[in-house]
A protein has these predicted regions:
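Non-transmembrane, membrane-adjacent beta-strand/coil modules in membrane-associated proteins
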Residues: 72-127
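Terminal and domain-flanking low-complexity segments
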Residues: 121-149
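N-terminal membrane-targeting/pre-transmembrane regions
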Residues: 1-32
Length: 149
């Protein structure tokens, strides 16, 4: 959709898909040796892999023109908010030493009026869309500030 300008998929999702593929391959390999139970073993493997695939699918962070949505890893619950539901946005800036030696990155923390919090790493994909994100923050007059880590 054109109204979505950033979707972040955490490493957790990629791991879930990789584990699902390995589980599927392992069950197919095992079913090769057990001819009588091969179909049952394959079916169990497919079902186990599907669980990992579903778990990986429900882990994302989304920023759009109209909404902010995310789902935590290992959760099937999707949190959806409008930009008007935001209380404040805080950019946490690590020091030079923290970035260089500890590998810390800038963090954007979105705090909602109901107390829910979304933390996003401000990486290259985020920075590429910063104009649209800042535009939404200004358009909806959300309090914005920076803090040192």
């Amino acid at each position: 959709s054109q109204s979505v300008f950033l979707i972040k998929i955490p490493a957790h999702s990629r791991w879930m898909f990789a584990i699902g593929c390995l589980v599927l391959a392992a069950f197919f390999f095992i079913s090769f040796f057990f001819h009588r139970k091969g179909i049952l073993i394959s079916l169990v493997g497919v079902l186990a892999a599907i669980l990992f695939f579903i778990n990986g699918t429900y882990s994302f962070q989304l920023l759009g023109q109209d909404e902010i949505a995310w789902s935590e890893p290992n959760s099937m619950k999707i949190e959806k908010y409008k930009w008007t539901d935001l209380e404040e946005v805080v950019l946490h800036i690590p020091s030079y030493e923290q970035r260089r030696y500890e590998g810390l990155e800038h963090l954007m923390v979105f705090t909602f009026k109901d107390g829910n919090i979304l933390t996003m790493v401000r990486d290259k994909a985020f920075t590429d869309q910063i104009g649209k994100i800042d535009g939404s923050i200004r358009r909806y007059q959300v309090e914005y500030r920076t803090e040192d880590m």
